[in-house]
């Protein structure tokens, strides 16, 4: 076991104090509305977001931010940070990204991560600070993509455990089944060109926007 792996495990740990557990990314509304009531619908929903949102936006931009931080190309860091913000389709999703990004930034500053307090034209997204942490800890870029995808997936299944609710065993079965998709999603993200990046999931945007007005919620909005 090497130090880079240990740093990656620390970065993707659910215990990392950034507050990701407080958000469901629209999943709470999708469940509450009955959209995912049929067998297999929950896994289908999470798979769709993993492949077409995380895989087409967060992961390929993470790769570009990693390389920009590594090259000290702050104009590129700024550009891709703004690109991610522009692709958050609801106020809720943008607020989540800002809150997680600022939380990781504060943590990184406290851990004396070089460049963590670099001023950008807009508040840092989570993926922006995640990329910087990966660079400073010498985590390989592909490993960092795997770690990000795993962390996102684990958080979604944890949210589903509370919302559906799933039993602990069923949650682990879902997690193990879906983790098999991560290699293909990451490999696809590595191949994408700049003009192919972005997200367009109407159901996710609808769920998130309606969650903002949901009467009773477990998760933040």
Curated annotation (Swiss-Prot):
UniProt entry tagged with the keyword Ribosomal protein: no
Pfam families: UreF (PF01730)
Cellular compartment(s): Cytoplasm
Disulfide bonds: none
InterPro entries reported for this sequence: UreF, UreF_sf
MF annotations from Gene Ontology: nickel cation binding
Keyword Cell membrane carried by entry: no
Subunit structure: UreD, UreF and UreG form a complex that acts as a GTP-hydrolysis-dependent molecular chaperone, activating the urease apoprotein by helping to assemble the nickel containing metallocenter of UreC. The UreE protein probably delivers the nickel.
Family named by the database record: Belongs to the UreF family.
Name under which the protein is recorded: Urease accessory protein UreF
Organism of this sequence: Teredinibacter turnerae (strain ATCC 39867 / T7901)
High-level lineage: Bacteria, Pseudomonadati, Pseudomonadota, Gammaproteobacteria, Cellvibrionales
Gene label: ureF
């Amino acid at each position: 076991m090497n130090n880079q792996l240990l740093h990656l495990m620390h970065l993707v740990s659910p215990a990392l104090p950034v507050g990701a557990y407080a958000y469901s990314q629209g999943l709470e509304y999708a469940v509450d509305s009955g959209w995912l009531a049929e067998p297999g619908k929950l896994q289908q929903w999470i798979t769709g977001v993993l492949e077409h949102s995380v895989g087409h936006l967060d992961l390929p931009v993470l790769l570009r931010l990693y390389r920009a931080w590594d090259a000290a190309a702050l104009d590129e860091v700024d550009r891709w940070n703004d690109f991610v913000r522009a692709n958050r389709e609801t106020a809720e999703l943008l607020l989540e990204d800002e809150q997680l990004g600022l939380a990781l930034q504060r943590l990184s500053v406290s851990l004396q991560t070089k460049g963590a307090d670099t001023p950008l034209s807009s508040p840092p997204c989570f993926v922006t600070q995640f990329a910087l942490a990966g660079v400073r800890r010498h985590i390989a870029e592909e490993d960092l993509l795997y770690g990000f995808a795993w962390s996102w997936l684990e958080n979604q299944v944890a949210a589903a455990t509370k919302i559906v609710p799933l039993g602990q065993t069923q949650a682990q079965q879902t997690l193990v089944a879906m983790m098999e998709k991560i290699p293909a999603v990451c490999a696809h993200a590595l191949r994408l060109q700049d003009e192919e990046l972005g997200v367009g999931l109407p159901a996710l945007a609808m769920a998130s926007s309606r969650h903002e007005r949901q009467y009773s919620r477990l998760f933040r909005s």
